Design a protein with these regions (language model features):
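Histidine-anchored nucleotide/phosphate-binding helix
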Residues: 34-41, 128-136
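Ser/Thr-centric signal marking residues that sit
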Residues: 49, 123, 130
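Internal catalytic-core helix/loop-beta-alpha segment
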Residues: 76-125
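Active-site acidic carboxylates
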Residues: 1-93
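Generic recognition of cysteine residues
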Residues: 24, 125-126
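Short glycine-/acidic-enriched loop or helix-start segments at secondary-structure transitions
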Residues: 18-19, 57-59, 103-105, 127-130
Length: 136
């Protein structure tokens, strides 16, 4: 593994992994196991992200949360917790109210010459949104 490679674990949270959640993602347990096996290969170079609801949705998020009002809870709500496998206080956590997680905070953690290895359960949404923003 490259010395500047970081594993960015995107949105492995209760809201996406708990069977009773309206946003439960099929295959979550299998993906969780694979990521848990992969993470130690990166040592300290692992960062987690969380999707959280905005306090006051704006723009396209207004009708989105009208469809999903259960998710309009504070960032401290257990729904937005990382699942137990990924509650690792030694690794940084970036929380964002958007699908994509690339921002100045994440860029600052990784540094200018880092290689990102992206993983998560919603590759068609949050993972790809992060990858595309980082590529820009």
């Amino acid at each position: 593994m490259s010395d500047n490679a970081w594993l960015v674990v995107i949105d492995m949270q209760v809201i996406f992994g708990e069977p009773g959640s309206a946003w439960c993602t099929p295959g979550y347990p299998e993906v969780e196991k694979q990521i848990a096996r992969l993470a130690p290969e990166f040592g300290d170079r692992v960062v987690f992200t969380r999707f959280i609801a905005p306090e006051h949705p704006q723009g396209a998020w207004v009708p989105y949360y009208e469809l999903w009002p259960f998710a309009l809870v504070p960032p401290t709500d257990r729904l937005y917790d990382l699942t137990p496998t990924f509650r690792q206080p030694q690794h940084p956590v970036v929380s964002r109210t958007t699908f994509g997680k690339w921002d100045d905070e994440l860029a600052g953690i990784l540094g200018p010459d880092a290689t990102m290895v992206l993983t998560g359960v919603s590759t068609d949404c949050c993972v790809i949104s992060t990858a595309l923003a980082a590529a820009d």
